Amino acid sequence: MIQNNSYDADTLHEECGVFGMYDFDGADVASTIYYGLFALQHRGQESCGIAVSDTSGPKGKVLSYKGMGLVNEVFAPENLEQMKGDIGVGHVRYSTAGSSTRENAQPLVLNYVKGTLALAHNGNLINAPQLRKELEYTGAIFQTTIDSEVIAYYIARERLNSQSAEEAVRRACQRLKGAYALVVTSPRKLIGARDPYGFKPLCIGKRDNSYIITSETCALDTIGATFVRDVLPGEVVTISPEKGIESDMTMALPKEKEARCIFEYIYFARPDSHIDGVSVYASRIKAGKFLAQDSPVEADLVTGVPESGNAAALGYSLASGIPYGTAFVKNSYVGRTFIKPKQSSRESSVQVKLNVLREAVAGKRVIMIDDSIVRGTTSDRIVRMLRDAGATEVHVRISSPPFLWPCYFGTDIPAREQLIAYNRTIEEICQIIGADSLGYLGIDRLKEMAEGLPIWTGCFTGKYPMEPPKQDIRGEYYDKEIDLERKMSR
């Protein structure tokens, strides 16, 4: 656990990406899933995997391959050629619950009396420790430390008393508390499920006579598929050759209770994705325009910290009239500092990830736009880099509000004491990162960013849609009582 004074431990961690596919013509899907995972690589860089099965072959035979590293590091052409099957699921992972090991890589494959299921999960369950203990008391033996295995066990258990695989998925999901976007393959069906709050994105696509369920629309574009629609919060969708797309909305909540993670629009998702009908790129442009209106400053250049700061920087430029320009060269072969599990890895990444174009900033007053400041390392280092390259002033603008509270739903913000904004004023943060001025996006602007969609902003406000646990997102219990302020809004 990072101590209170280690605000320079860098920013957040999220998350995972899922991609499932069923080809009704019987064509192999492993290679297409591979390209889909490539498009989702930004959602997780620790491990990845693919599991496929042949619906015309023996019921329950699943071929699975997974490993640590990036998609192109784990899979070789010979791996994909051996994976014969017309239905399958893939996953890219960052560990928000459970350690970063090959055993915890997904998809999970579970053999049980009704056959075999493969599961990929994005999110975090706040009641996973209790559910896990309940299963262990009934004889379950876990092979991983991740909450996703709890989901798989419950689906298998519920299948014994259900008429169908999709009913088992729905009944299992009704036990879960937290965030989840699931893709599950049964021997003859592709199933997707999204939690009732809609924390994590999930959508459906179609290519020729095949269907896809995946985290982001950019993955559909990559494989030449057509977007069909989003999976709705609380929905279980089932795809089969006999019935096409079926929908079960039993778990759906009233729309005003939905709680999409706003950080998908601010940072997590690729800018070329659309989530619940809203363009991620357009949202970031709006954020930049709002910053220019609410936190103006005289300057010569507006620039974004690649990649997620670029669109907001362009929006700031459009609204302010200050020229937009490129000030950073990014090393494309270094993963995001956001998605590095160890502090030593994060700091090394910051040092080699970016270089400043001296010709672009020397002698200029620079406005630097970034998506967030969580612990502070990246902002502090980049401000110094700009000054070393000759910038006369560095004004930092952040396209999100200050992070003040932990997240329990799949984003690694484990303790308030680790957050640079905890018990500090904006002026104090500005001094710590070495900027001439600092401005954050106002909390009231977030819903406008998401075009009025119901969103969740608990990491900024401390208001949760459900009672938070006395544990961090990696399952480590706190001894102290949870602050009253942290509790959900009534």
Residues covered by each model-derived region:
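Conserved short alpha-helical segments that host acidic/polar catalytic motifs at enzyme active sites
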Residues: 1-233, 238-299, 305, 393
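Flexible loop/turn segments at secondary-structure boundaries
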Residues: 96-97, 127, 191, 199-200, ...
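Secondary-structure transition/capping motifs at alpha-helix termini
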Residues: 140, 161-162, 296-300, 318-325, ...
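A conserved beta-strand->alpha-helix junction
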Residues: 144, 149-152, 324-335, 432-450
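PRPP-dependent phosphoribosyltransferase catalytic core
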Residues: 173, 188-189, 224-226, 230, ...
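Extended, hydrophobic alpha-helical segments in both membrane/secreted and soluble proteins
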Residues: 302, 309-316, 320, 324, ...
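Short, glycine/charge-rich flexible loops or terminal/linker lids adjacent to PRPP-binding catalytic cores
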Residues: 321-366, 376-377, 404-412
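Mobile, glycine- and charge-enriched loop segments
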Residues: 355-369, 373, 398, 474-481
